[in-house]
Amino acid sequence: MANVSIHGPTGVLVVDGQKVFPIGLSDPPPHDGQAPSGEHAFRELANGGATMIRTGTPNWALGRINQQIAKEKTIQDSAAAHGLQCWMRLGPAADLPGAAANAQILQKVVTAFKDHPALCAYKGIDEPRNPFRGAKWIRPAGLVRAHTRIKALDPKHPLVIIQAPRGPVSQLVPYRPAFDITGVDIFPIAYPPGLHSDNGNPDISVVGDMAYKMDEASGGKPFWMTLQIAWSGVAPSKAAPDLVPRFPTLKQERFMAYQAIVHGARGLIFFGGHLTEVCTPDDAKAGWNWTFWRQVLRPVVHELTSSQLRPALLVPNAKILVRTKPHSEVELAVRRAGKFLYVIAVKRGGSTLLVELLGLPKRQNGAPLTKGEVLFEYVQRPLPPPPRPDRQVPRPIKVSGGGFRDWFSPYDVHVYRFDLS
């Protein structure tokens, strides 16, 4: 059994005593599938940095509960064997009293998996306050009762409720007692853009807007952001035959992930790899969008889980006021981990600017900072010519008077690291 709790100062998960910034895939490849590399599908994801997958079913039914539990156990066994954990859907059963069988289903499912080594967290009813539910939106009271019951059955795994990117914060506040972690789905890329949310921002920077909204709605509890691989708004169907497939580029996905982190997200979920109707023929046969994983998602996840950056995702925001001059659309998060200070900077949009960042502290010995580095951006030192392939280092930054200048184009991400020792 994995003992999973929430780290109070940060909101990240603590899994068997180790802090984890969860990176999940919803839904994953088939549990018995194979990646194009030849690896087991789940092992490929774990090796690439993913920590968990969404599992479970949205329609647990008492009449076939034993078969459903057996199927879920096979998936969780495979996840555990290949280095992944599971975020298990409870579906409508996580609403009490709800349907007559809900309480029985909830007890059977939670009891069946609460001691499974792959279980990471439970997923409550999806988007309970989505305006598209109309008058049938899910009232908080039943979800609060379900949360209480789940915690009585299994106090060692959190319950997560993800909301829709629509409606005011005031509609989400009543759900606070119903979850341990909340979050939001936000899929801004489509033709035309901006269809998924209702806040009027058609740009990919709507991710930051939604993160800000969930930070307010959460009441101090942690939140995750569910970001786009694909979604129903880019997948043609009989009901919407004229939709045109569209996916985030590497730059867009990287920006959305880092902007979510800058605005406080303590976990990221990537949705839509299982929508085979918009995959290549080979990926459709394999049951998952391995092309997107290879070209876009794996490079982003590799950065987030790297030894250079990972420590910064597991600590609170530092109480250091780093600011930009002139005022720009650059958004910042400042973290202190060990001897390093991290400044994660993203540019929402606008024009290309040379931006000054000010407010860096002195080193631990009182001496001023004179240099830093930009992670994941590489240059040769000493400078060429001649080219020396064995001399690539992170791009250096010169610091003077507690500040430095750097270029930002729209949707740029720069991850700065400074050695304070």
Report the location of each language-model feature.
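N-terminal carbohydrate-binding accessory modules
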Residues: M1-A46, K151, V160
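Aromatic-lined substrate-binding rim segments of carbohydrate-active enzymes
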Residues: S37-V110, A135-V160, D198-V207
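Aromatic-lined carbohydrate-recognition surfaces of secreted/lumenal glycan-active proteins
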Residues: W87-D95, V144-S170, S218-V234, F270-G273
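Aromatic/acidic polysaccharide-binding cleft in carbohydrate-active enzymes
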Residues: P241-V300
